[in-house]
Amino acid sequence: ASAVKYYSRWMEGKYCDPAKNQYRQHPLDYIEGLEATVKDALAQCPDGTAPNVVGIAFDTTGSTPVLTDKNGTPLALLPEYAENPNAMFVLWKDHTAIREAAEINELAKRWGIDYTAYEGGIYSSEWVWAKMAHVLRIDDSVCKEAYAWIEHCDWLPALITGKTKPEEVYRSRCAAGHKAMWSEKWGGLPTEEFLTSLEPKLAGFRSHLFEKTYTSDVKVGTLTPEWAERLGLTTGVAVSVGAFDCHMGAVGAEITPR
């Protein structure tokens, strides 16, 4: 069975401005889409299928990050930010952070460590640090509440397992390594000094984020009672670490190391 749900706000063209290369998505679009598609798919299955569903996994297009509060709640889910595009997910194809990406590249080339070494040697305006630096730089209002950021592929597993606090989220190695300049070689994310040299408003973010990352064969947890009820599934359903769609396509195609 398969199901499709068009994002209602996206279909209305909300929060996007093609003239500025701005493409934002409200987190409610994702929540509503998840509920609708799972229920629709189950409705197409024989009776008794739901108790036999044992796992859920997510792949998303990235980098699609969002600023969160201390509880890991995307800022757009708070009443005061509900209509602020800078408090929403910054879609992968949003290119409002071209300037910040250029600054990251210039900074990385003169830093002691080239944090773009495993990013293809050049950082993109489509990626998380450029986007978060841009949003914080242009919008003082979101700075008051912003505590951390999270990728779309990490937020959905965290949401439905009840593990949303930034320090306890299982972060995708796929997303962190490719977009956030994370590497075991230099101890995780770029240093606080590097990040604040890029944008002083990034101060403190690194300590609220992560050192460890996980691959998608790792279990984040199981559905919370609330989400089991919302999806029509059981609390025994396992949820895996998320990843990016293009990378998971390679897995599906059975691409293996040489």
Question: What does each model-found stretch correspond to?
Answer:
Residues A1, T64-T68, K179-A180, M248-G252:
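Short beta-strand scaffold segments in enzyme catalytic cores
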Residues T68, H95, N105-F244:
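Gly/Ser/Thr-rich active-site cleft segment
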